[in-house]
């Protein structure tokens, strides 16, 4: 079945107002105070982001933080309201929430996992079926799953181009959404819904959310060990 709703976006359809959240003075002050300080305004912001990350478009761009703040402190101050931090060596493509703060202004491209899924549904159903049986723990670069009506797509380390079927390559090369990140920006995304085509040099924090896809039956045993091993 096609994956419908806001998670199946196309880059040309989105305007910046749909994914960019300018931070206000109180939110900035709480982040600048560090991850141990009280953060009621950040908790309210996280409450806005959670549904978008879990079953919406799958990402938000936070803008307005000073670029000279320590990246690790910024990410922890935000992340503690969105989930439980995974070990630093955990696989950043297998988590419920990934926070990225580029080391310098950067351009990157986001892809909707649901849109890739739907493109394969139209053009190559046998391939899509095989990706539902794929095992990320065995090195498969792309895998899909639906459990309890909840969709998840996994895109791990790159596979050799020669090994990628043409229909999948075409879907992965779709325009997507090109983002221009400024100094201080933080990208918050759900890697099970949104894939990075090219990841810039960036500080990151991977999180497990309370409503997690990491425990989906077909992925949980092997992938939890993979996340722990990095």
Predicted regions and their residues:
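Short alpha-helical segments and helix-capping/turn motifs at coil-helix boundaries
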Residues: 43-48
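Active-site environment of non-heme Fe oxygenases that use a 2-His-1-carboxylate facial triad
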Residues: 1-42, 55-60, 64-67, 82-230
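Short amphipathic C-terminal alpha-helix that caps PH/PH-like domains
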Residues: 74-79, 168
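Short, flexible, solvent-exposed loop/turn segments with mixed acidic/basic and small polar residues
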Residues: 49-54
């Amino acid at each position: 079945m096609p994956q419908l709703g806001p998670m199946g976006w196309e880059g040309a359809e989105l305007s910046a107002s749909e994914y960019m959240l300018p931070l206000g003075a109180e939110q900035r002050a709480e982040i600048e105070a560090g991850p141990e300080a009280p953060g009621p305004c950040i908790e309210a912001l996280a409450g806005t982001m959670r549904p978008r990350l879990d079953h919406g478009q799958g990402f938000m761009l936070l803008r307005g933080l000073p670029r000279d703040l320590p990246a690790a402190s910024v990410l922890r101050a935000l992340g503690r309201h969105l989930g439980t931090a995974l070990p630093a060596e955990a696989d950043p493509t297998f988590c419920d929430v990934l926070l990225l703060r580029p080391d310098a202004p950067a351009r990157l491209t986001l892809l909707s996992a649901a849109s890739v899924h739907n493109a394969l549904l139209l053009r190559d159903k046998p391939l899509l079926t095989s990706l539902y049986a794929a095992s990320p723990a065995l090195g498969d670069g792309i895998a899909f799953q639906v459990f309890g009506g909840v969709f998840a797509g996994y895109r791990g380390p790159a596979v050799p181009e020669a090994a990628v079927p043409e229909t999948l390559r075409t879907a992965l090369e779709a325009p997507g959404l090109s983002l221009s990140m400024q100094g201080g920006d933080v990208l918050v995304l759900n890697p099970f819904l949104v894939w990075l085509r090219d990841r810039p040099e960036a500080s990151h924090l991977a999180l497990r959310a309370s409503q997690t896809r990491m425990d989906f039956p077909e992925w949980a045993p092997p992938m939890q060990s993979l996340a722990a091993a990095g």
